[in-house]
Curated annotation (Swiss-Prot):
<comment type="function">
    <text>Negatively regulates transcription of bacterial ribonucleotide reductase nrd genes and operons by binding to NrdR-boxes.</text>
</comment>
<keyword id="KW-0479">Metal-binding</keyword>
<comment type="similarity">
    <text>Belongs to the NrdR family.</text>
</comment>
<dbReference type="GO" id="GO:0045892">
    <property type="term" value="P:negative regulation of DNA-templated transcription"/>
</dbReference>
<keyword id="KW-0805">Transcription regulation</keyword>
<keyword id="KW-0678">Repressor</keyword>
<dbReference type="Pfam" id="PF03477">
    <property type="entry name" value="ATP-cone"/>
</dbReference>
<keyword id="KW-0862">Zinc</keyword>
<dbReference type="Pfam" id="PF22811">
    <property type="entry name" value="Zn_ribbon_NrdR"/>
</dbReference>
<dbReference type="GO" id="GO:0003677">
    <property type="term" value="F:DNA binding"/>
</dbReference>
<keyword id="KW-0067">ATP-binding</keyword>
<keyword id="KW-0863">Zinc-finger</keyword>
<protein>
    <recommendedName>
        <fullName>Transcriptional repressor NrdR</fullName>
    </recommendedName>
</protein>
<dbReference type="InterPro" id="IPR055173">
    <property type="entry name" value="NrdR-like_N"/>
</dbReference>
<dbReference type="GO" id="GO:0005524">
    <property type="term" value="F:ATP binding"/>
</dbReference>
<feature type="domain" description="ATP-cone">
    <location>
        <begin position="49"/>
        <end position="139"/>
    </location>
</feature>
<keyword id="KW-0547">Nucleotide-binding</keyword>
Length: 155
C-alpha cells in the first residue's frame, strides 16, 4: 500500500485487528521509506441494487433519501434517531440479502411502510397517505382502521 505521506510503494503491517463490530479489519502500518505510521481499514464492499422508478428510469440507491423520507414522516414524533438508523439498516439489509441487481421503488416504499408501522402508527398513516396518494377521507379512515385492527389482540 502506498504511503499517504511520501507516496512510497512499500509499507509494513505492524498490527492487524478485527473491529468490535466484526465488520472491518484495522491495520496499523509503517512506511519503510519515511518511517511514518498510519492506519487503514478493510471493509466488505457491498453494492446496493439500482432503484427502478415508476417512470422506468434508474438511479443509485440513496440511503440519505430513505432517511429523509423516514424523518419527514416521523417529524415531531417520539422516535429516537437510533430507532430511525436501525430501521434504515434493516431496510438496507433486506435489499442486500435479496441478491437482486435492481429493485422497484415501490418495494422500497413497502419496506418503509412496514418499518414505520413498527416505529410509530401516526408516522405510518402520514407516509401511507402520500405514498398511496390518498384522495379522500375514506382512505384515511381505512388506513386508521387497519392500524386499529392490528393493535387488537386476537381472541
Amino acid at each position: 500500500m502506498k504511503c499517504p505521506f511520501c507516496q512510497h510503494d512499500d509499507t509494513q503491517v505492524l498490527d492487524t485487528r478485527v473491529s468490535e463490530e466484526g465488520d472491518s479489519i484495522r491495520r496499523r502500518r509503517r512506511c519503510t521509506s519515511c518511517d511514518k505510521r498510519f492506519t487503514t481499514y478493510e471493509r466488505i464492499e457491498l453494492t446496493m441494487p439500482v432503484v427502478v422508478k415508476k417512470n422506468g428510469s434508474r438511479t443509485d440507491f440513496d440511503p440519505k433519501k430513505l432517511q429523509g423520507s423516514l424523518q419527514l414522516a416521523l417529524r415531531k414524533r417520539p422516535v429516537s434517531a437510533e430507532a430511525v438508523d436501525a430501521a434504515i439498516h434493516r431496510i438496507e439489509q433486506k435489499l442486500l440479502s435479496s441478491g437482486e441487481r435492481e429493485v422497484i421503488s415501490g418495494q422500497i416504499g413497502e419496506l418503509v411502510m412496514r418499518e414505520l408501522q413498527r416505529l410509530d402508527k401516526i408516522a405510518y398513516i402520514r407516509f401511507a397517505s402520500v405514498y398511496k396518494s390518498f384522495e379522500d377521507v375514506a382512505e384515511f379512515q381505512d388506513a386508521i382502521a387497519e392500524v386499529g385492527r392490528e393493535r387488537k389482540p386476537a381472541k
